[in-house]
Amino acid sequence: MDNEIFQKIFDILQPVLPTGWKKMVLFVGYTAGSYTMKYYTCDNQGIFTDCFSQSGINRAQLIKLFMSIDKAVTPERKKLDGKNKWSVLTMIVTDDGKMKTDFDYTDISDNAIAYEQSWKEKYIK
């Protein structure tokens, strides 16, 4: 996947990020036939807020947002062969424009909840 797709993802998210955000961490996880997404924003005091707890956006709006991200990501994932097809994308963006992405190729189908918890311990700090 190239930088263009990452910019597209950020362009989808940027309008709903809260005022004063310093860092945004996005989790995109795919299992057989489904996906899960969530993002966290960090303020200038180092406090992370889960997107589902963010004021100014409701669950229906988030689901629509995540569907737009999936629509952008899925064609790119389909181009990848089996061994290069990632199951989890982590995207970290700071308010100064720095962007970092990590990919995990582990099949999370059988333990998605446990995986997401360990992911959170790694990235949300």
Task: Give the role of each language-model region.
Residues 1-125:
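Contiguous interface-forming segments/domains that mediate binding rather than catalysis
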